[in-house]
Structure formats: C-alpha cells, structure tokens
Amino acid sequence: MPEDIPQISAPTIYDHLAVILDQMSSVAWQKLGLQPDMVTGKIEPDLTQARVAIDVVGFLASQLETQLDEEDKKHLHSLVRDLKINYVQKQGGT
C-alpha cells in the first residue's frame, strides 16, 4: 500500500451516535414548528413527536459526553437546553 494514501479507520459507535444526534435535533426543531419539514417544506408542529425527539437527543448527548472536550460538551448541553426551553414555550409554559 503506498505511503501517501491515508488510512481510513472505521467509524466508532460514538461517530454513529453523533450523526444520529444531529438528525434527531433537526427533527426536534421541525416538530417544534421552528423549522420547515425537510420533506414537505411546511411548518408542521407536532409536540408529541417533538418531545420524543428531544428525549432521544438528551439520551444520545449523555452517551456522547464522555467522548467530548469541554467546548463540545457546552455546545451539546446548550442544544439540549434550547430544545427543552422551546418545547416548554410551545406548550404555553413560561
């Protein structure tokens, strides 16, 4: 194998979780009615589905936390917090 070709390693479970977390956070924003649906292009809030997506994001964040540096941990915590705050606001809470 030539030395100038970089070796590519297989993704870890944490790499896969990060991708899923990113997808679920997008779904959560869509289901909160804060982003258009990726398929229809319409704003279609569904707070029941938003809650599930937010719970999944929170769980995935807890699994990834040990693999992250402090800056990435803060970003992840902010994401989960922002999703939860927006969920409460959409429900009519304060």
Where are the model-predicted features located?
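Well-ordered alpha/beta subsegment
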Residues: 61-68
